[in-house]
Swiss-Prot record:
Gene3D superfamilies: P-loop containing nucleotide triphosphate hydrolases (3.40.50.300). This is Ribose 1,5-bisphosphate phosphokinase PhnN. Belongs to the ribose 1,5-bisphosphokinase family. One of its GO terms (molecular function) is ATP binding. GO terms for biological process: 5-phosphoribose 1-diphosphate biosynthetic process; organic phosphonate metabolic process. Pathway: Metabolic intermediate biosynthesis; 5-phospho-alpha-D-ribose 1-diphosphate biosynthesis; 5-phospho-alpha-D-ribose 1-diphosphate from D-ribose 5-phosphate (route II): step 3/3. The lineage of its organism: Bacteria, Pseudomonadati, Pseudomonadota, Alphaproteobacteria, Acetobacterales. Its EC number is 2.7.4.23. Catalyzes the phosphorylation of ribose 1,5-bisphosphate to 5-phospho-D-ribosyl alpha-1-diphosphate (PRPP). It catalyses: alpha-D-ribose 1,5-bisphosphate + ATP = 5-phospho-alpha-D-ribose 1-diphosphate + ADP. SUPFAM superfamilies: P-loop containing nucleoside triphosphate hydrolases. Keywords: ATP-binding, Nucleotide-binding, Transferase. ATP binds at G12, P13, S14, G15, A16, G17, K18, D19. InterPro entries: GK/Ca_channel_bsu, P-loop_NTPase, PhnN.
């Protein structure tokens, strides 16, 4: 059965501010029953900068996911409940790894938004987090240069408000896109 909704995949390098952009767009959007922002499930402790559901490895293995992947020793999942949202015609907005975009495009009607920032900005943001060594940050920055096929780009280099407004504009235009088989 064709899905009438659309899965908006938000991708970008670590430090680009994907969660910040999503949070700001969601705040600006207010109540919109046709646009949903499901929480990612991650095998990582809670983090105030990232809206996710923290779970153990065992709990992660018991869950059902529409999309899942592993990166940096962690497991990430998008709840299977998004399939019902897509079937109901909703726009479902999720922060995912660039590595799963091709698989997601094969399985769901997708629109990919890349959130970007200059390398110096990425480096500064990653350093402030204090989750990684300088070598690990360098490796992340090297991966950040890898291209991703995106339908739209949000440059998050000024304020969260500006990037959130740009992203919200993209989301609102997604309402007008034709349904995909």
């Amino acid at each position: 059965m064709p899905r009438s909704g659309r899965l908006v995949l938000v991708v970008g390098p670590s430090g680009a501010g994907k969660d910040t952009v999503l949070r700001e767009a969601r705040r600006r959007l207010g109540h919109a029953p046709d646009i949903v922002f499901p929480r990612r499930v991650i095998t990582r402790p809670p983090d105030p900068a990232e809206d996710h559901e923290p779970v153990s490895d065992d709990e992660f293995q018991r869950r059902a996911f529409a999309l899942s992947w592993s990166a940096h020793g962690l497991s990430y999942g998008i709840p299977a409940s998004i399939v019902g949202d897509l079937d109901a015609g909703r726009i479902v907005v999720v922060n995912v790894s660039r590595a799963i975009v091709a698989d997601a495009r094969r399985r769901f009607p997708c629109f990919v938004v890349a959130v970007t920032a200059a390398p110096a900005i990425l480096a500064a943001r990653l350093a402030v987090r204090r989750r990684e060594t300088a070598a690990e940050i360098g490796a992340r920055l090297a991966r950040a240069a890898a291209p991703v096929e995106a339908d739209a780009v949000v440059a998050n280099e000024t304020t969260p408000e500006a990037a959130g407004a740009a992203f919200l504009g993209i989301l609102l235009r997604c309402r007008d896109l034709p349904c995909l088989p």
